[in-house]
Amino acid sequence: MLRRLLSFLVRWCGLLCVPGGALWALSPTGVYISNFAFHTPNVFWKLFWPAPLLILLGLIGLQLRQSERSGLPQKIGFLVAAVGLVMVTAGDIGLYWLGIDDMFIVTAPAYHTFRIGLIVLAVGSIIFAVTSPRDGALPSWGLLPFVIGSLCGLVSFSRDLGTFGAALWILFGVGWAWLGLSLAVEGFMSYLQKRRSSTAAAAKS
């Protein structure tokens, strides 16, 4: 029973990319609401950390699904993206919850961890998608939008581009949500195909 539960969690943990990516994509809207209601974006950024955390858990699930078929470059991409997500989560919590930068104003370690983590995440996401095995768990029609979204994220994270940068930030989150959604659709279609095959076999017998 426990083994089946763990197998189920590993198989479908990748779906957490959907809520994580959606929360990420809604960040500019959250910043706007926070500025409008509280006259500061910090209220939103305090609530941002679940987005990268959910994406991290989803990424781990995706990697576990295809770990036996993935090569070294794809595993490197996974590790780089995972490190980036950990840095983003830690930087956000350190900056807005623990107030680390209030004690180290000059070096601002939490802020720099957050910003560097974004770049590392984008680079790792691109490597992870481009090097994913063709016969892996991720459908090709889900990987292409993910690559585009990761490229948009890399541009957005590199410098402040105002409204255009916010749009690219949204596309990065949409790319992760799309990747998780493609996994769900692929799993549902596979389930329907198995049902049809079993029904046809039962009818013949």
Task: Give, region by region, the residue ranges found by the protein language model.
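Hydrophobic, aromatic-enriched alpha-helical segments typical of multi-pass transmembrane helices
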Residues: M1-S205
